[in-house]
């Protein structure tokens, strides 16, 4: 090989080597370095352990079990064949249940945030600091609706976290969790923000932050940090079919948690605005049925009697498009916005009613402590009426109307093959509206059913066990 050609090969090799080094350096720069963040934030993250005393139902050796409640023949068998030992009085022994979780210090004088489910019903709460010292904690208050709890330990000059703004958090942003999964203190995991504003079943007042950060039992109550080292959420839940982490974790936005903690510190409880409605999502078929251009808003499925919405003129079948200028994209947006108001504050609603836009001003009330439940009543023997939907219906009795807070409607007595069976209607279901029209009686129901359009989504309001929702169906040609 000639010398010029050898030089050419060597230069090409050197160029490739340099390019590889540059690409490696760029890749290293693209990946975040969490070390400084962890060193600065870890001291303010704590382990939380609880103890709870529970009645011990175990039977001591040689002791006669409590046979009360057994059928006579079994009780006689055990009394004949087991040694006659004195029975243990109920509740005279106790066992101790323990649980583990995480938390973080938000003030140098000892206020600690964690999850409600970490400390619920605890008789004793121990906070272990990063230096492994332990402090007894006092429960300042809890808010089960957001799963936030505020604790207080005696201390001075304690390390604290920096609080961020969860509203500024962006999907795709790097985040990091520090906690005690399975009791392993100060374990660090990282990931990205997968989505914002998630709503989970039974958690309508929290717009959760979804991440792919590995969260396991013991992480609950621990902080979720952004890359600035600021807490942007409280790790709260995971979605799993295996019992372990599956890539879906949910954190309570720190803005929500701080608002709750401030109220707990000041009043010992949390106050929220309340409209007094049951709402549901507007899907494509419902949007077509109610004359909307696209699926959006919150459909009012039920208006509670004497509630703020009823007094303010909101009606069943209204679609709420915005509140105080903020659009309702998903139905879950409404509880978040209403919950942020105080008793007596105004909610300016933009709605669609019968295809027309209009505005309502409603003074919100205070969210009751207990959920409102409406009984289903007992079925009466009113005259039946059949129709083209494949259902046999009857008028509601006066008792049913009172129980369900309805002025009219019909109860399904029988479901035959047809559209009703296909959409899952059952005997006992109550229908109050059909094709956006209120139903007064079985006769009216049949008359409206005769005029239903074909090959177009038609809405029907159904109450099952006191719970109302709109469903849609289509009649074929």
From Swiss-Prot:
Reactions catalysed: Acts on substrates that are at least partially unfolded. The cleavage site P1 residue is normally between a pair of hydrophobic residues, such as Val-|-Val
Ranges of residues in domain PDZ: 264-355, 361-466
Enzyme Commission number: 3.4.21.107
Residue sites binding substrate per the record: 218-220, 275-279
Subcellular location: Periplasm
First-tier enzyme category under EC: hydrolase
NCBIfam families the record matches: degP_htrA_DO (TIGR02037)
Name of the featured protein: Probable periplasmic serine endoprotease DegP-like
Lineage: Bacteria, Pseudomonadati, Pseudomonadota, Gammaproteobacteria, Pseudomonadales
